[in-house]
């Protein structure tokens, strides 16, 4: 279940990220740790996400969070890149990574295979859509076990 502060944190972080040429990919607030950990995954919209991107986002967001006192008490702020082998789960991620190379694994074979590679075109209630060398593929959503970014780049 999503922490109730997440929407407010996203509202604060998004304009900061946009000003830096970044995008918020995921926000997690781990309140079961002491002190609690607020983790944001970011990506650079124009180049590979680097340490400088994480540092700039961290400094800017920390100042804003401290000024608003949204999070009471002490907490740890972690800013990182989601990484190339990231598993996609949310609608937001499927939109953000449209056009990226992905690997789709299915629970049971679909058209005689359990692993598909191609460029992500999107997903809806019925299917995950790929483009594999110009061929459109729609994999039924109920068969999809996971979708992750392809770090092998062999499509």
UniProtKB/Swiss-Prot annotation:
SUPFAM superfamilies: YhbC-like, C-terminal domain, YhbC-like, N-terminal domain. The lineage of its organism: Bacteria, Bacillati, Cyanobacteriota, Cyanophyceae, Oscillatoriophycideae. It comes from the Bacteria. It is found in: Cytoplasm. This is Ribosome maturation factor RimP. Belongs to the RimP family. Pfam families: DUF150_C, RimP_N. Keywords: Cytoplasm, Ribosome biogenesis. GO terms for biological process: ribosomal small subunit assembly; translation. Required for maturation of 30S ribosomal subunits. InterPro entries: Ribosome_maturation_RimP, RimP_C, RimP_C_sf, RimP_N, RimP_N_sf. The gene is rimP. Disulfide bonds: none annotated. One of its GO terms (cellular component) is cytosol. It comes from Gloeothece citriformis (strain PCC 7424). Coiled coil: none annotated.
